[in-house]
Amino acid sequence: MKTNQSRRKFLGNAAVGASVAALTSPLHVEAAMVESNQQARNASQPRQGKPPMSVSSANGLAAVNKAVEVMRGGGDTLDAVIAGVNIVELDPKDNSVGYGGLPNERGDVELDASAMHGPTRRAGAVASIRGVRTPSKVARAVLEHTDHILIVGQGAREFATAHGFEDMNLLTEESRIAWLRWKETLSPVDKWGASPYTPAPASPAGQRRIAAERARPSYTLAENYANGDERRREELLAWADEVARKPPTGTINCLALDAASDISGVTTTSGLAWKIPGRVGDSPLIGCGLYVDNDTGAAGSTGRGEEVIYINGARSVVEYMRRGSSPEQACLDALKLIAARYGNDLEKLKDIDVNFYALNKRGEFAGAAIWSHTVTGRGELRRRQFAAHDGREGRLLESAYLFERKA
C-alpha cells in the first residue's frame, strides 16, 4: 500500500544552518510561512510540569510512573530512571528492549544501554552485551565502579559477571518465532525452509502433502515451533509476519528531574532487529542516544540509531536548549538536521523513524518525531506519542513532528 505523505511544514523560524540552507525552494518557503504562526503558539506555551517528574518514550508510561514514585520516596534521579526502565527491560512483551528483545541475524539477543547522572556529571554504557536482562544496571555499574564510559561485547559480559549479573537466555518464544519467520523467508535460494530435493512420496497422500507445502506462500518452520491453541498460534504467526516485514525500531529512553533540579537519564535497547552481530546504534553512545547536562537539561532518542549518530542527536537537542530553545523546538531543530541530510526529500525520508525526548531544568518537556504517524507492518497508521509524568499524573501525549503522514 502506497502511503500518501503530505508535507507538514517545519514548526519553526529558528532552523539550524544546515536546514536553512536546504529550505530554498518556493514550496519549502511557502510551507514554512504557513507553519510559523503555529510554531509561535507552541513556543509560547511549552508543556511544563512540577518536579519530581519524568519523560519517556511511548513504551515508558509505567517507567515514568515508577520514576516519580522513586523520587517521591527519596531516591536519586538515577535510581528513578533505572527503576523505571527495568520494568520494560524485564517485560517479555516489549520486543525492543531487554528480555524478549528481537535478536540479531544469528538469533542472538545483543543489548545496549547508557546512563548519565547529572549531579556528578558521570556516564556509563555497555554495548553488544548478551545474557543480561537489565543492561541499564550494568551501564550504571560502569558509571559507578570504573573510570571508563563504554564497555562492549565479551568484555561487557565478563564485567557483568564480575558484578553478579546472571547469564540468562534472553530469547522468548515470541522473539524466536519472529526471527525464524524472518530467517526462513529471507531468500528463496538459501538453505532455510523446505528442501527442493524432497524424495518422491511413496503414496498419493504424501504427494498431496508435498504439493500443498510447496503451494504455501511461506515456509513452515515458524508454524512448526509455535505453541498454544489455534487462536494464539494465529495471533503469534500474524505478529511474526508483521515484524519480519517491518522490524520495530524500539528502545526506551527515560529522563527524570527532581525537586532539587537535578537530572539523570538512561537509554536501553535490544537494537535493530536482525542486525549484523556487533552492530551498535545510538543508545549506548553518550551524546547520541542520551545526553544530560545538569545545568541545562537532558535529551534522549529512539528510532533509527544510525541517523541519530550522524548528528549527535541528544547532544544537539541539549545544546539547542542551552542556547534558549524550548524542549520542543530543540527536538524539532535536531530532527531538521536529519531531514537536511536527505535534502528534505520526503521520498527518501519516508522510512526513517527517529524520535527525540527532552526535559529542561524548569520542568519544560517535549517529544518530537520526524513523522506524525508511524506505519505498522500491516500498513496501519499510528500516531506518534511519548510518555510523561508532569508531577500530577503519568499519561501518553502526542509528539510534535516535522512532516505529516496521511493515509
Task: Give names to the regions the model predicted.
Residues 2, 35-36, 42:
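Intrinsic low-complexity/disordered segments
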Residues 376-392:
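Glycine-rich phosphate/cofactor-binding loops in nucleotide/flavin-utilizing enzymes
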